[in-house]
Amino acid sequence: MLWFKNLMVYRLSREVALNADEMEKQLSAFAFTPCGSQDMAKTGWVSPMGSHSESLTHAVNGQIVICARKEEKILPSPVIKQELQAKIERLEGEQHRKLKKTEKDALKDEVLHSLLPRAFSRFNQTFMWIDTVNDLIMVDAASAKRAEDTLALLRKSLGSLPVVPLTMESPIELTLTEWVRSGELPAGFIIQDEAELKAILEDGGVIRCKKQNLISDEIAVHIEAGKLVTKLAVDWQERIQLVLADDGSLKRLKFADTLREQNDDIDRDDFAQRFDADFILMTSELAALIKNTIEALGGEAQR
């Protein structure tokens, strides 16, 4: 089981019936296939259980996990530039004239087509967890763009997907700043030693603190000067450490060893049973964390 490292959280904006059996059929039409000789990139669905299953969905207790794979061909710019320049120089020498921009653009396309079959590929996978009980979708991505790209593939597969980023009633950066200023956090949360502070004005600078006592005069001076806490490392229930960000994302999730070891009594050779047990454990913990985080940040914005 791949334990999620980041959470970009989205709210289903209207009631949608998502079930694994129906999704299985819909996702299969967009299953991953490798790049052909002239493809720059390909994206599609693969089994969240890897080679242990052919199913594109895995569901337990109303929780569904799916996985998108992306293949990208790597063509370094210097290689393209070198090949293109050689072609341009050869043709200009043969024709005794300077090539027009449109001709150079056409040559660049030719160069790309000739290089693609020999290009190396880069692969990445993005897991998505759909909580049908709480109408939430979580993407294991550190950036909004990667999360949105994966949601776009799911939207294309399902035909529609009415989701919006999870937002709070109060600006998150104001809440985080007050936590650091006062040194008081809601029950269950303990401040750690890492944060990012930004000035309200765009050109006012950014301060990134690591291994720093955040409840200190030094940090208080920055807050008094108008800087806001935009990222804050916290510990939740001594079970999960994470960084809360002002965009509502939960980054760099680190599960306590005592938590991850709870299913060690299950034979690791029984992959399906261990995957099930770890998925149930992870999603139940993260669902509780998300619920507590929403409450701690002042509640979700009313739609």
UniProtKB/Swiss-Prot annotation:
It comes from the Bacteria. GO terms for biological process: DNA recombination; regulation of DNA recombination. Keywords: Cytoplasm, DNA recombination. GO terms for cellular component: bacterial nucleoid; cytoplasm. It is found in: Cytoplasm, Nucleoid. One of its GO terms (molecular function) is double-stranded DNA binding. InterPro entries: RdgC. Its main location: cytoplasm. The keyword Cell division does not apply. Pfam families: RdgC. The keyword Signal does not apply. May be involved in recombination. PANTHER family: RECOMBINATION-ASSOCIATED PROTEIN RDGC. Belongs to the RdgC family. This is Recombination-associated protein RdgC.
